[in-house]
Amino acid sequence: MIILGIDEAGRGPLSGPVVAAGVILDQDKIIDGLADSKKLTEKKRQSLYQQIITHAKAYTIVEISPQQIDELNILQATLKAMHQVANNLERQFDKVLVDGNKLPNWDYNSEAIVKGDSKIIEISAASILAKVHRDNICLEHDRLYPQYGFAKHKGYPTKEHLENIKKYGVLDIHRKSYKPVQVLLNE
């Protein structure tokens, strides 16, 4: 059975897109060390990212913008990204395994698996692709807006990030529907 593993990164941050990735692994090309991206060092994630995009049978990465997140809400934006991932790889898999407890509204043979990124290697691989891709976006944001410190906090609502929003203002890359950003917009 050919499995498509799907996971996302970036639901909690105040800025940047939510990213979903899907991976179909080549059973003849074993990638050692696949695990939940949150449990790996940045260096290990980068190394595995390269191995996954080189050796996977197929993969895709989808971004949903902060503006779309504000329009839809984060759950619907995440489900939309996952749906797009499956559509991008349509007819290449027999079953979809998604990390978490919610599935998009689709007709694919699928299952949501809580902590799937720690249990299913295809989901682990998707977790790594989504996390590294999103982290790279944050590094680009840091290059464009160095005073905000995106390389350090990756958009999460740290004290430093909130202070920098207060000091320098809300950017287009910020999610304006998120309460901490709304509060700062209304000050």
Curated annotation (Swiss-Prot):
InterPro entries: RNase_HII (IPR022898), RNase_HII/HIII (IPR001352), RNase_HII/HIII_dom (IPR024567), RNaseH-like_sf (IPR012337), RNaseH_sf (IPR036397). It is an enzyme of class 3 (hydrolase). It comes from the Bacteria. Manganese or magnesium. Binds 1 divalent metal ion per monomer in the absence of substrate. May bind a second metal ion after substrate binding. A divalent metal cation binds at D7, E8, D99. Residues 1-187 form the RNase H type-2 domain. GO terms for biological process: DNA replication, removal of RNA primer; mismatch repair. It is found in: Cytoplasm. Pfam families: RNase_HII. Its EC number is 3.1.26.4. Its cofactor is Mn(2+); Mg(2+). One of its GO terms (molecular function) is manganese ion binding. One of its GO terms (cellular component) is cytoplasm. It catalyses: Endonucleolytic cleavage to 5'-phosphomonoester. Keywords: Cytoplasm, Endonuclease, Hydrolase, Manganese, Metal-binding, Nuclease. The keyword Metal-binding applies. Belongs to the RNase HII family. PANTHER family: RIBONUCLEASE H2 SUBUNIT A, RIBONUCLEASE HII. Endonuclease that specifically degrades the RNA of RNA-DNA hybrids. This is Ribonuclease HII. It comes from Francisella tularensis subsp. tularensis (strain SCHU S4 / Schu 4). The gene is rnhB.
